[in-house]
Each structure stands twice: as C-alpha cells, then as structure tokens.
Amino acid sequence: MTTLFISDLHLDPARPAITELFLDFLRTQVPGSDALYILGDLFEAWIGDDTPSTAADAVAEALHAVATTGVPVFFMPGNRDFLVGAAYAQRAGFRILPDPTVIDLYGQPTLLMHGDLLCTDDTAYQAFRAQTRDPAFQAQFLSQPLAARVAFAQQARAASHARQSELKQGDQAQFETVTDVAPAEVDATFVRYGLDRIIHGHTHRPAIHTVQAGGRTCTRVVLGDWYEQGSVLRVDADGLALEQLAL
C-alpha cells in the first residue's frame, strides 16, 4: 500500500488543464491508497467557504468521492488557502491538519508542513503570516462582504507579485535565499521535533535532501508544484519516490 502527498496545485479557473489533471489523478491514482495528504495551496486563492466557485465545487465532489471509498484525505492549509474552513472540509470529505503535524508513516515519525514556516529569511512574509493566521484577524476578514474580501485578495496578490518581480530583478542569490528554506531553521526544526524526516511543499523546488541535524542523518522531502505538470510523492514501507504527472 502507498500513501500519497501533494501540494501547491494552485487550482485556478484560469488554468483549467491543471484542474482536470488533478481530477483525473483523484479518479485513477488515489483509489486503493492508504491515504492522501494535501500539504497546502490546493487553491490559488481562498477568501471564504461561501465564495461561489464551480471549480471548487467539482474539486469538493471529487475529493468526497475518494473519501467515500475508504481512502482518508487530509488537508493542511497553505499560504494561499489558509481560510479553507470546516464547511468546505465537510463538503470535500477531508480532515484539516494543523501546520505542522507529526504522523507515523510506516513506522517512521514524519513531520508534515506546508513549508513557509521554514522560510524565515523572508521576514516581511513571516510578519504577514503571523497577522493573517491570527483568529481575530480571520474572523474580522470573513465577516466582511464578499466584494470587500475579493478586493483585499486582489490587492494582496498584486503586492505579492510585485515583490516577487522586484526580488527577481535584484540580486539572484538574495532571491534564492529569501524564497527558499533557511538551512538553520530546517536544522532547528529537526532538533526541536527529534525526528529524521520532514515532508513539505511551498518552495516549488521538488527534491529529496539529506542533511545532518542534531548529530543525525535526516531527510527533507520537498514536493513539487502543479504549474507545468503534476507532482506526487509516493511513500510505502519500502521507501519513497517523487514523480511527475504529465499534462
């Protein structure tokens, strides 16, 4: 049996081919698995469970169909969809996990994260993250009319794209540092949790890294994004493998 991990699909009506690839993945590759874990950024944006979206409806229906076959589905919010709530989770048949979460993966304790908590060199983002994860902020935001939430999301996305563009046009080494995990934070996280494996997404740099932390040899698995293709991590009792899914 196999456990599947995905992240950073960034599903968006503007990219229907990726949504179709994901729906096909759910129909053809997930049934019979031990579990499916979605480690954040399933959607490009999420401003409340009450937002009308035919694409989100189709995704919820497909995920619920998977869950009804007996495959448990878990969702960990990312930086784009941290407002996914209990109403959508019920429709989709998944359980929302806190970030981070430790699971027993075929006998090996494994830390699951979206990954943005490891990017501590991006101090501006970490401040924004702390603000937007505050329950009081979220309650106030979700109480606003839909039009106001849409406007806020558009402004936030424009600011994010402008900052990314500014970083890319500047020092390339600085761009790579700010947009990737901080090695010191990775080491500290391994030591803090006392385990030897982390699985995360967020950085869109799929790879399997071997690092030394706390006097132990540890593994950090980075999931891939779903922009030009799909990406899935398959884990079983014998090991793990990152795979691409062609459009």
From Swiss-Prot:
GO terms for cellular component: cytoplasm; extrinsic component of plasma membrane. Its cofactor is Mn(2+). It is found in: Cell inner membrane. Its main location: membrane. Its EC number is 3.6.1.54. Pathway: Glycolipid biosynthesis; lipid IV(A) biosynthesis; lipid IV(A) from (3R)-3-hydroxytetradecanoyl-[acyl-carrier-protein] and UDP-N-acetyl-alpha-D-glucosamine: step 4/6. Keywords: Cell inner membrane, Cell membrane, Hydrolase, Lipid A biosynthesis, Lipid biosynthesis, Lipid metabolism, Manganese, Membrane, Metal-binding. GO terms for biological process: lipid A biosynthetic process. It is an enzyme of class 3 (hydrolase). It catalyses: UDP-2-N,3-O-bis[(3R)-3-hydroxytetradecanoyl]-alpha-D-glucosamine + H2O = 2-N,3-O-bis[(3R)-3-hydroxytetradecanoyl]-alpha-D-glucosaminyl 1-phosphate + UMP + 2 H(+). Pfam families: Metallophos (PF00149). InterPro entries: Calcineurin-like_PHP_ApaH, LpxH-like, Metallo-depent_PP-like, UDP-diacylglucosamine_Hdrlase. Mn(2+) 1 binds at D8, H10, D41, H204. It comes from the Bacteria. Signal peptide: none annotated. Mn(2+) 2 binds at D41, N79, H114, H202. Binds 2 Mn(2+) ions per subunit in a binuclear metal center. GO terms for molecular function: manganese ion binding; UDP-2,3-diacylglucosamine hydrolase activity. Transmembrane segments: none annotated. Hydrolyzes the pyrophosphate bond of UDP-2,3-diacylglucosamine to yield 2,3-diacylglucosamine 1-phosphate (lipid X) and UMP by catalyzing the attack of water at the alpha-P atom. Involved in the biosynthesis of lipid A, a phosphorylated glycolipid that anchors the lipopolysaccharide to the outer membrane of the cell. NCBIfam families: lipid_A_lpxH (TIGR01854), PRK05340.1 (NF003743). This is UDP-2,3-diacylglucosamine hydrolase.
